[in-house]
From Swiss-Prot:
SUPFAM superfamilies: Glutamyl tRNA-reductase catalytic, N-terminal domain, Glutamyl tRNA-reductase dimerization domain, NAD(P)-binding Rossmann-fold domains. Belongs to the glutamyl-tRNA reductase family. This is Glutamyl-tRNA reductase. Substrate binds at T49, C50, N51, R52, S107, E112, P113, Q114, Q118. Pfam families: GlutR_dimer, GlutR_N, Shikimate_DH. NADP(+) binds at G187, A188, G189, E190, T191, I192. Possesses an unusual extended V-shaped dimeric structure with each monomer consisting of three distinct domains arranged along a curved 'spinal' alpha-helix. The N-terminal catalytic domain specifically recognizes the glutamate moiety of the substrate. The second domain is the NADPH-binding domain, and the third C-terminal domain is responsible for dimerization. It comes from the Bacteria. One of its GO terms (biological process) is protoporphyrinogen IX biosynthetic process from glutamate.
Amino acid sequence: MAFIALGINHKTASVEVRERVAFTPEQLVEALQQLCRLTPSREAAILSTCNRSELYLEQDQLSSDEVLKWLADYHRLSLDELRACAYVHSEQDAVRHMMRVACGLDSMVLGEPQILGQLKSAYAVAREAGTVGPLLGRLFQATFSTAKTVRTDTAIGENPVSVAFAAVSLAKQIFADLHRSQALLIGAGETISLVARHLHDQGIKRIVVANRTLERASQLAEQFGAHAVLLSDIPDELAHSDIVISSTASQLPILGKGAVESALKKRKHKPIFMVDIAVPRDIEPQVGELDDVYLYTVDDLHEVIEENLKSRQGAAQAAEELVAAGTEDFMQRLRELAAVDVLKAYRQQAERLRDEELAKAQRMLVNGASAEDVLAQLARGLTNKLLHAPSVRMKKLTAEGRIDALSLAQELFALDEGAPQDKGLQ
């Protein structure tokens, strides 16, 4: 079996490419089933966020080329374009990569906790799709356990820093006094929830949450004393909004240049600060061409994020060591499982040989042979049959120059432990 982790992220691909490779929640189950049907992958899970799209796969033999081709075809990209920004990790490196992702060590925001929840969602969807088997199931559980240890035993999660925090920090640089500002938040997911919390804690004057469903918007709005509206109400709310932060799973832009131009006229060209955290983007890039709009994408938040990461750098090394230990522990358990399978097969073979010799012994007794002769024949027959296959294989391997096979056999059968010594050499 071969395990691989394959994908793109914020370090290897621009937001333009990432939004083209992103999977919507509605696509995931069908995509997983298609992936297992059309590639050599027996097990599969897909993690798709604004900063990364990754595939975790178990295959009979490592075959990343076919998976890359499937991914390019699925999203209608050229294979060369995808290869230019894709990475592939295999076996132990893939395990380590997945654990680093879960711990936030590979995130744009070092140590951010949201990625673990997103990875758990990816696991749940893969289970729903029926594409998680023994290996991925064990790996996900080991990954979650390691991430929990990292959160508990290091300071990687202290001093909250996230894309949401960075967006609010940037807003504070533009609007020094948030107490007088009004914010329009588009979406109602985890990131927007974090944005709302940070804005609320900063004492912003008013928050409006716009979402596809009013019920979900209301649930979030109630937590922070905000107002809930539908996406169709956005044009009316824009004119009153100093800050607009958007993060939905929409495949098409929600906010266009025309709507923003109209809002600016009503605001008498008072500036609007916008952050588009979504991938694919919620706000048309052309909006950034307007004179009174400060439009930032998730990639533009790097500088703000870097300034808030210094306190986490010390904890990162301790987290890396825990990830290394978690990786080695998982690989050791995999090796032990492989040994269990071999031992099970060997025991079944031995029991079959035992039953054959026992049947012969019973026939000898029926035919009148003495118990002493039957026992002697049973012992000889069982010994010869148990030793036949290993003896033939050992002779063949040594004839081929595999002298190491002798040492391995000696260790395997404990021939150097308690072996009778040749007294003639004493």
